[in-house]
Curated annotation (Swiss-Prot):
Subcellular location: Cytoplasm, Cytoskeleton; Cell membrane
This protein's name: MARCKS-related protein 1-A
InterPro entries: MARCKS
Membrane topology: Lipid-anchor
UniProt main location, coarse: cytoplasm
Consequence of gene loss (knockout): Morpholino knockdown of the protein results in reduced head and eye size and a ventrally curved body. No significant effect on formation of craniofacial cartilage. Formation of ceratohyal cartilage is disrupted with an abnormal angle relative to wild-type. Morphogenesis of the developing neural tube is abnormal, with a smaller angle between the walls of the hindbrain neuroepithelium at 24 hours post-fertilization (hpf). Retinal development is significantly delayed; no retinal ganglion cells (RGCs) are detected at 30 hours hpf and reduced numbers are found at 60 hpf.
GO cellular component: cytoplasm; cytoskeleton; plasma membrane
Family: Belongs to the MARCKS family.
Keywords: Cell membrane, Cytoplasm, Cytoskeleton, Lipoprotein, Membrane, Myristate
Gene name of this polypeptide: marcksl1a
Purpose of the protein: Involved in the control of cell movement by regulating actin cytoskeleton homeostasis and filopodium and lamellipodium formation.
Tissues where the protein occurs: Expressed at low levels in brain, eye and muscle.
Bias kind Low complexity: ranges: 149-158, 175-185, 193-205
Region listing for Disordered, in residue ranges: 1-213
């Protein structure tokens, strides 16, 4: 029984040393290393002879020695692998940072657009408030222009009627002028006609005087 216990302990220690020799990183066992010690130990245990116990006792020692000697190498490999893993993670981080920056840039652009839209939305109510005033002013202006246009349109017929009235007035004035000119001509004629009569009368008066002599 004691031999069996030692066998179990030896196999457990051998597995642990083999695992250390293979190298454990962050709880993940790497299987890249050669696992030569385990089959030898298992083969010795499978023989079941008395010499196997001695071989088992020697095998753990050699395994422990190999493990001690391999430990620095595994530590160096582990450090290298850690460095490589760190580099990979850094690269991944760099890529992720770039991607995140890109996404952040896009999100910032979107946020900027959203903020601009929000600012415009905030500004639009004020402009909308201003616009109703402008629209109100424009409406009042249009209303003012419409009556002005109506007044301009309505005087147009009146203006058209006024020239007709003016034309009628000159026509009425023309007959008046004609009537005025006609009496003046008659008066001039009447004034001219008595003049010869007056001239004839002296001749008649002059004639009888010599006749009387």
């Amino acid at each position: 029984m004691g031999a069996q216990l030692t066998k179990g302990e030896a196999t457990v220690e051998g597995k642990a040393v083999a695992d250390k020799a293979n190298g454990q990183e962050n709880g993940h066992v790497k299987t890249n290393g050669d696992v030569s010690t385990k089959p030898d130990g298992e083969a010795v245990a499978a023989d079941g002879n008395g010499t196997a116990e001695v071989a088992k006792d020697e095998a753990p020692k050699t395994e422990e020695g190999d493990g001690i000697e391999a430990a620095p190498a595994t530590e160096a490999e582990a450090s290298k692998s850690d460095g490589e893993a760190a580099k990979e993670t850094k690269k991944k981080k760099k890529f992720s940072l770039k991607n995140s920056f890109k996404f952040k840039g896009i999100s910032l652009k979107k946020n900027k657009k959203a903020s601009e839209e929000a600012a415009e939305a905030v500004a639009t109510p004020t402009t909308a408030e201003d616009k109703p005033e402008e629209n109100g002013q424009a409406a009042t202006e249009t209303k003012e222009e419409e009556p002005a246009a109506e007044t301009n349109e309505t005087p147009a017929p009146e203006a058209e009627a006024e020239p007709k009235v003016e034309e009628a007035e000159p026509k009425a004035e023309e007959p008046a002028q004609q009537t005025e000119t006609a009496p003046t001509e008659e008066t001039t004629k009447s004034e001219e006609s008595p003049a010869p009569v007056e001239e004839t009368t002296p001749t008649e008066s002059s004639d009888p005087e010599p006749a009387a002599e």
